[in-house]
Amino acid sequence: MKYLNIILLLLSFNLNAQAWITDDDFESKINEKQAFGDNQNKPVIVEFYAKFNDANKFDQWSELKDVIYYRADIAVCSAAKKKYKVRMAPTLIIFKNGIKETVFKAGLDLTLPADLSDIQEAINEVNQASQF
């Protein structure tokens, strides 16, 4: 029973875990379908991140609701970085069914010009727009 509790505890931490995305799986991840049908698909946020700018990464990702969150290292995801015209890190892109919906780009000071509430509001708008 003790081991079962430990396993359940570890699994619960993984539910909010942030996953990394690479060029190899980028398109499949932003086009992910959930098990409950198209109307239940959550938007996907990809944060383009740079190790040299670790101080300015988006740390509040676990507080976002109704979204799947991935982080992409710009040194590893050069094809995706080029395709989506990412020039600054951090950059957050919200996708819905593989379509780019909203972009939050860092400024020249390499800080994200949006806070948690701005990003959550954009997620909510994407979710509402896809309901019919």
Language-model segments: what does each one mean?
Residues 32-33, 76-80:
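Short acidic active-site motifs
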Residues 68-76:
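Short, internal strand/loop/helix patches
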Residues 84-96:
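Structural micro-motif
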Residues 94-132:
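Non-catalytic, surface beta->alpha helical segment in thiol-disulfide oxidoreductase systems
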